[in-house]
């Protein structure tokens, strides 16, 4: 980290890296339980693959008599009411409001996590570079949630992690491949 550049320091209970739906739900759920949260996201809009940038609508597990509930259902109902034509700019606004209306969330958009500070084997701080302000954001927290989609905290911290698919017999998953491989982006089969 270049110390000649501006840095903004945050001290929170939970740092969530990644503002896709998983990161948003983690941040909102924690904030609603009184936890002080910093949400670092590397894009200008929330939602990850479900944002206007990628445009993968939220489908989830649902059928005739069942569907996703909780914060995802809250988003779905708000969208049904305010965005019946499913326009992505409105969708982005609904997601933006969800985060910004939570008083316990400090949102940090356009900020890519690129370094961490460890205390022994525990992450102490996450450091991100915000392109829009040309400054670093340093977030100290007790807990960290890696919802980045690319699992950036694991390699930065030296944690053990898997790349690819597990073999069929590792977890007794009948549709998994016979041998583990390095394929990504999809289901086990």
Label each residue range with its predicted role.
Residues 10-12, 133-143:
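Core beta-strand elements of the Rossmann-like FAD/NAD(P) dinucleotide-binding domain
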Residues 106, 140-144, 157:
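Mature extracytoplasmic enzyme cores
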Residues 117-138:
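Conserved beta-strand-loop-beta-strand element in the redox core of flavoprotein oxidoreductases
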């Amino acid at each position: 980290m270049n110390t000649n550049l501006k840095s903004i320091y945050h001290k929170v209970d939970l740092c969530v890296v990644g503002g896709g739906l998983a990161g948003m739900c983690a941040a909102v759920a924690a904030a609603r339980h009184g936890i002080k949260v910093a949400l670092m996201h590397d894009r200008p809009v929330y939602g990850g693959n479900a944002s206007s940038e990628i445009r993968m609508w939220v489908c989830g597990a649902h059928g005739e008599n069942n569907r996703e509930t909780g914060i995802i259902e809250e988003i779905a109902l708000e969208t049904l009411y305010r965005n019946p034509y499913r326009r992505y700019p409105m969708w982005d606004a609904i997601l933006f409001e969800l985060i910004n209306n939570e008083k316990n969330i400090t949102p940090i958009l356009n900020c890519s996590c690129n370094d961490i500070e460890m205390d022994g084997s525990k992450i102490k701080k996450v450091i991100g570079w915000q392109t829009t302000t040309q400054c670093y954001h340093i977030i100290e927290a007790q807990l960290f949630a890696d919802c980045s989609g690319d699992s950036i905290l694991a390699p930065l911290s030296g944690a053990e992690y898997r790349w690819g698919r597990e073999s069929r017999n590792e977890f007794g998953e009948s549709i998994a491949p016979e041998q583990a491989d390095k394929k990504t982006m999809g289901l086990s089969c």
